[in-house]
Design a protein with these regions (language model features):
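Short Gly/Thr/Asp-enriched flexible loops that form oxyanion-binding sites at enzyme active sites
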Residues: 4-5, 60
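Gly/Ser/Thr-rich loops at beta-strand to alpha-helix junctions
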Residues: 21-25, 47-54, 78
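Active-site-lining helix/loop region of Rossmann-like oxidoreductase modules
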Residues: 63-183
Length: 183
């Protein structure tokens, strides 16, 4: 919530968050800048994927290449070892029906950060990306019972998900792709 963050900043509290705000690009951040000035505070957006490795590896590795035609960064995670059952069940919607998972807010929620990652990579590598971001969400269901931190995921219920976002360049897909896959 940008207004809540602005209030915290204006009150003099520094804010460090893994939720967005690591590459504002062309977004209007004047309210946040004013709040930082008023509170003599700072806002630091960071993360691993996105907000860290997603951008830094492609940019770092690009120095070893003479021409870059596309960039793809993906994260894979195994929920069987993820220590946050409420996140797995209530937010990521594992163990739910495919229809329930299709209504997940995760595409939008995660997409805000991944879009910033794509914009940073595009800007630094000189790609002139189109304004539209194409997002995707695929689910796979268990074919056998799977033991997980939320209990057994029964056959027919969501056991894997793939979220993806991509920027097109002059209408061409697959130039800059970011993804998050968990199973």
């Amino acid at each position: 919530d940008p207004q809540l963050v602005a209030r915290l900043l204006a009150s003099g509290k520094n804010v460090v968050t893994p939720l967005n705000w690591f590459y504002p690009g062309k977004r209007d951040v004047s309210a946040l800048e004013q709040a930082c000035e008023a509170g003599n505070s700072t806002l630091h957006g960071t993360g691993i994927h996105p907000g860290g490795i997603t951008e830094r590896f492609p940019l770092m590795i690009s120095a070893l290449s003479s021409a870059i035609t596309h960039v793809r960064a993906e994260e894979f995670s195994d929920i069987r070892t993820y220590g946050a059952p409420a996140v797995i069940s209530d937010i990521m919607l594992f163990g739910k029906t495919p229809e329930e998972a299709a209504a997940s807010p995760m595409v939008h929620f995660l997409g805000q950060g991944f879009q910033q990652s794509m914009e940073m990579v595009a800007a630094e590598m000189g790609f002139a990306v189109d304004a539209k971001v194409i997002s995707g969400h695929e689910v796979a269901v268990a074919t056998a019972p799977i033991d997980s931190p939320i209990g057994i995921i029964e056959p027919g219920l969501v056991a894997a998900q793939r979220f993806s976002w991509q920027h097109t360049v002059r209408g061409v897909r697959g130039i800059i792709v970011m993804g998050f896959e968990s199973a």
